[in-house]
Amino acid sequence: MSGQPKVLRSVALCHSPQWRFLTLAMLRELKRKYGTAVHVYVFSDQGLKFYAKHAEPGLIDSIQVCALISDGAQRPFTGDRGALEAEARRIEQRYGVTYNEIMMTDRHIGRGFSLLAPNFPRSLQSEATDYSGVLQKFNADFAFWESEFREKRLDTMIFPQKIPGVVARTLGVPTRNLSRTRIGNLFHWAENGEFIELPRLQAVMANVPRGQPPVELATYSQYDTNRKIAIANFGWLRALRNSADWTVKFAMHRATGRSSGYQWWSSIRHYFGLPAQWREVRRLPLGTLADLQGSPFVFFAMQEEPEMSLSWQSPESWPQIAYLWQIARDLPAGVKLAVKEHIYAIGRRPHGFYRHLTDFKNVVLLDPLLPGADVVRAAGAIATITSTAGFEGAWIGKPVISLSRHSLYNFLDHVRLPDLEPGGMRAVLDDIFSGRIDLAKAAEDGARFHRALAGVSFDIGSYNMNKPSSLEPERLDEMLKSFEASFESASEPARE
């Protein structure tokens, strides 16, 4: 057994189904190399069955079922409401976060925060949960996780949910999330599970020499696959098939006494809302890059809602519609705002939303099927909360208006974070379109940033979550080395 790093004495894993075989293999290596105490948290009996079947005796030191944020919040509260609220405020003060911010991260009980997704399917959780139930559940969750961290002396947590991520931050316990780098098939180990950041990246970039080749933008393969699947759902026949499949599944769940989660009618309405809203979009005068030729423009990349990268990683950000309105208001004369919808968001938006966008005289609604990378190349600047377009713009030296305080590229000189005070957005736009950003330096810095990000990443190869044999040994070794290296230059202290 090798010398045991402090951060690997006792490791907790919050079960992530898509990475289950990969993380199981990783836990085996940690146990073999360091004798790490392994504590696993699953969110259903199905998770328990997985480890009972695939984990050998002695690998896992403890395993237990715990609830996701919205699970159990439907239990009626019958106690002293004043005491309940006082305890909630005490916990908020201790951890420096409001319960409402945590609620945002759940697509069920936090659906009210997704202002541009009123047509997202409703669920049993969203409809049967009241505010007191949320307070009761969160009070219990914070007590549970603080007890777990202390009693099991956890040194690191992998894939934390939001509440354990907040507790880990407060107790000084490092966390790691496997996060897509957005370069080819690369992934990296993100820090700070509360917001999923990578603070060491700036120091890594400082060691990347100048003179890196310009970045050639390319769409990663999974995006193309997902895009084809989304477009296939825009047909009426597919809507009928999806509805039939859902009805059978819903009936089987009811017959066996299981919860079906989403409401039957709400899901059916969503399936048929997809082709209906797609046709609503296609009937509008959609812009092309040829229409924008010769006109400087800001590219606003819309994102789907609800979405983890918005509500979890950027809870401080305003709703997308507020930023769109603000930028359209503050643009200099002659500059347009080009808005491109995320293909997954179609069917969720309010009725008439796209038609209303065309009422802005300085806004161009782009064809959603336009390749995003082409729009990034042509734009004068990119405005986004957390979309891939922000990374692409940063890599090729385009000015980026970052609307998230937690984006990995925020430290770059050609990235601007608007001041929240009046005039903040206007000042940023004036900087960009008055030529105050050194575009040659921006392109050089962007290429170095790209190289640094690739340097802390690894390729997971042909891994398929349903095929344990698809995990290649050399890929596992690469991933584990990257995991261990992430602690060497990280900012978090190890628990004593």
What do the predicted segments below correspond to?
Residues 13-24, 308-312:
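A short, glycine/small-residue-rich beta-strand->loop->alpha-helix junction that serves as a flexible
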